Amino acid sequence: AKMTAGRIVQKLCDDYVVNLSADTIEDCVEAGKELFSEYKPRDWDDDKDASQLDICQMSFTDVLKNALEGLNEAQNKLRINKLTGEEDLMFQVPGLELEYNGRPDFSGQIELKTTWASVANTKSGKRSSSIPTQPTWSHLCQVAGYWAMKRKPQAIVYANENNFRVFTEENCEKLSAEALQNIWNHMVTKCRIRENLLKSADTIQDLLGLVEPDFSHMWAWDIHPDALNEAKKLWRFV
């Protein structure tokens, strides 16, 4: 539900500031309600996803407003005249055989990240989300890829129901050109290793024998139990 909520907020931001197809915030909110109604909660987690959906629906209006404020601040900081929406980037990287793919959210320079309260065994039934004091590693890796192609300054906007925070190279050293180059070098090395693994394996089973799965990862294996069991069989864990 959280991932869907994030996509909905991004689409509503697109409608309001990029496509100009929504005249008011209220129009966006009504469109958001319609989009949420189309989501079908997963049916294998004891209704946790359904409860999470309720939480996201109750707070998405505030998250949207904070996201829009954050985007406006980021646009001004990066001196972008007019925002464009998400684009699909494919580019060749020296030393790699496969093209690199990325999808920046706005103008190839701004990445929007929403954080949502979670289902919890508390009186309110939820646990509030927080905005990071520094960008997370995975988000830095994302924008490093966009920087590598565009060679333009990057911003990361975090928004929740209470506030927003904008990171640029002005207040975050990790978004400087030098830091992004170092992160990009790290990513290219990892991509090269993965390409070598793919080339060295003749079959899927050969490839699985070269990669150690982390089934204890906090979210990577948060999938349907049948699919998880099938994966464990492929790796011969069961």
Predicted regions and their residues:
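A structural signal for short, well-ordered beta-strand segments and their strand-loop junctions
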Residues: 84, 108-112, 154-158
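Hydrophobic/aromatic-lined pockets within catalytic cores
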Residues: 13-21, 114-117, 148-151
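Non-catalytic protein-protein interaction segments used by genome-maintenance enzymes to assemble
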Residues: 89-142
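Metal-dependent nuclease catalytic cores that hydrolyze phosphodiester bonds in DNA/RNA
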Residues: 1-103
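An active-site-proximal "capping" alpha-helix that borders the catalytic cofactor pocket
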Residues: 9, 137-150
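Metal-dependent nuclease catalytic regions and adjoining charged, substrate-binding loops involved
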Residues: 147-238
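Flexible, glycine- and charge-enriched loops at secondary-structure boundaries
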Residues: 2, 132-136, 173, 177-180
